[in-house]
Amino acid sequence: VYKNWYDQEIPTHMVKHIDKKIVLWQAMISQKQQRELDSLFKTEEDLHILIMNVEALSTQKGVDFAKKFLFSHRALMAVDESTTIKNPDAKRTKSICDLGLASRYNRILTGSPVTKSPLDLYKQCEFLQPELLGFSSYYAFRARFAKLKTMNYGGKSFQLVTGYKNLDELAEIIKPFSERILKKECLDLPPKTYIKRTIQLSTEQQKLYTQMKRMAIAELHGKTMTTATALVQLMRLQQITCGHFKADDGSVKQIKNNRISELLSVLDEVEGKAIIWCHWRHDIQNVVAAITKEYGPRSVVTYYG
């Protein structure tokens, strides 16, 4: 999503007469990338735009740079797909809300601010402005708008959300500072809009990919992968980008990658059922394991040959 702002949205929609400098944050910072990042702190008349993915704000390096940028500019901070900061306990959510205090203006954008629960609104609104909803804590907000039942498990008690209440009141609270625009009202769009999500390779993937691309051979944990033809080489490169490494002896090694975490983010944003297409059987196994862990054993079924 964030790379789409760099490639398409800002170049297309920002007026041409504004001089601007746009820098895209990258997990792997080269010397060229570092020079681009440093240029954001030069004193000049250009509008400075920093584009970061939310995953970067789960890292201290990303948070520190964003904080430096915000403290150096009279900034507007916008979070696209803002349901990514709905979880009040997530480290990323806390980091982004803290960063919001350093910006002059805050905005959120999302297709649906409530994906599964009205309680999703609290942290998104807190980013806009603390206590914007009129509650000083998430738990006070939850007590007002959720039906709670005290449950006991393993000798501990906890509050289970069984339903929701006072939703008309909540709708009135958010009305003054929210704006809903339907697709048909703003753009002449096709019936379906396809969104491409660009996922960065992990350090391990990048190393193996480079080895395979240059020398048609790669090595991981003592296992070797070689190719005899260009077609097989392309297939091996695709396996590496998918997050696994099939050695010459037939064994499969998992490679650290960002695909599953991005998939779970997508699932968190959609309502109802979803169809997930995979290229390799090993991918299917990884997807099933991740969804089962997140949503339970009866949340996913497979169909493949």
Where is each model-derived feature located?
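Conserved helix-turn-beta segment of the N-terminal RecA-like "Helicase ATP-binding" lobe
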Residues: 2-30, 128-132, 293-297
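Inter-lobe coupling linker of SF2 helicases/translocases
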Residues: 51-57, 63-71, 90-104, 134-252, ...
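Conserved motor-coupling elements within RecA-like helicase/translocase cores
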Residues: 32-50
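A short helix-turn-beta junction within AAA+ P-loop NTPase domains corresponding to the substrate/partner-engaging
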Residues: 105-106, 121-137
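Conserved Walker A/P-loop ATP-binding site and its immediately adjacent core
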Residues: 1-11, 115-120, 279-284
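Conserved helicase motor "Helicase C" RecA-like lobe of SF1/SF2 P-loop NTPases
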Residues: 277-305
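Walker B catalytic acidic pair
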Residues: 80-81
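Conserved helicase ATPase motor motifs in RecA-like P-loop NTPase domains
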Residues: 104-118
